[in-house]
Amino acid sequence: MEPQFKVKIDNDSARILKELAEKKRDEGLRVVFIGPPGSGKGTQAPLVKEDYCLCHLSTGDMLRAAIEQGTETGKQAKTIMDQGGLVPDEVMVNMIKENIQTPECKKGFILDGFPRTVPQAEKLDKMLAEDNKKIDHVLDFAIDDSLLVKRITGRLVHPSSGRSYHREFFPPKVDMIDDITGEPLIQRSDDNEEVLKKRLESFHKNTTPVLGYYQNKGILSTIDASKSAPFVSHTIKSIFLSTLHFPHNASIFKTFHQKMKMQVHSTETPLAAEIL
């Protein structure tokens, strides 16, 4: 669908806008992805990671890596998991802290799978504040549960990177082969309707308070995750651009900024698709 409004930007203004966007990339971003299984987080994370030179931190991947590498946090987690227990919040936060201090996370990070509860969100904020940092954006990948069944049952995953594809909506260039590495894709054994319903019930119960926590902080943006992958990608760019500090004496940027903020919650083609 064509956007109902457009902003004409001259060459100088367009140049300034691109420079501001680059500044945003240089400053770094700390982003939390929240969404149910099948909402498209796994598709969008590599795109945002590449565009903004961020690291993608998935709690499951971090746990496995820490255990395999034998880090102190990994040893603690393994001992607890071997006894059938849940990894405490403090251990998870320490593991995240270890990861964000690596060179790969210098420009910021995408955190996927954490926090799942308000106490976890509070502990994460406290840990970041100790280093004078904070979460910049929380993206809520909102989608109706009924649409997730079709997505989940057709989902394909590249095990080592976590890249996600879909047989119908986002197929790989070659069937069952990862576009980047040429390695085989898999379909997870728990990607079925029965397991999905249980996961969704747990997700909604735990996540609703977390969304409220970030809403109160003014950093929550809700995305219509039922849209196509390119549309969602451009929406994410629009959200990031909407927080740029435009020159106060440039009326064209004030207009653009207002339109961009309006469009974050719109169903129209994001302006970021036309400009960047």
UniProtKB/Swiss-Prot annotation:
Binding positions for AMP per the UniProt entry: 59, 64, 85-87, 113-116, 120, 188, 199
GO molecular function, one term: ATP binding
SUPFAM superfamilies from the UniProt entry: P-loop containing nucleoside triphosphate hydrolases
Compartment(s) of residence: Cytoplasm, Cytosol; Mitochondrion intermembrane space
Leader peptide range in chain numbering: none
Region feature (NMP): 58-87
Entry binding sites for ATP: 38-43, 155, 164-165, 227
Biological processes annotated in GO: ADP biosynthetic process; AMP metabolic process; ATP metabolic process; purine ribonucleoside salvage
Catalytic reaction annotation: AMP + ATP = 2 ADP
UniProt KW Signal keyword: no
Matching Pfam families: ADK, ADK_lid
Gene Ontology CC annotation, any one: cytoplasm
Top EC category: transferase
Self-association state and partner proteins as the record states: Monomer.
HAMAP family per record: Adenylate_kinase_Adk, Adenylate_kinase_AK2
Note on domains (UniProt): Consists of three domains, a large central CORE domain and two small peripheral domains, NMPbind and LID, which undergo movements during catalysis. The LID domain closes over the site of phosphoryl transfer upon ATP binding. Assembling and dissambling the active center during each catalytic cycle provides an effective means to prevent ATP hydrolysis.
Similarity field: Belongs to the adenylate kinase family. AK2 subfamily.
Record-given protein name: Adenylate kinase
Protein's organism: Dictyostelium discoideum
Gene: adkA
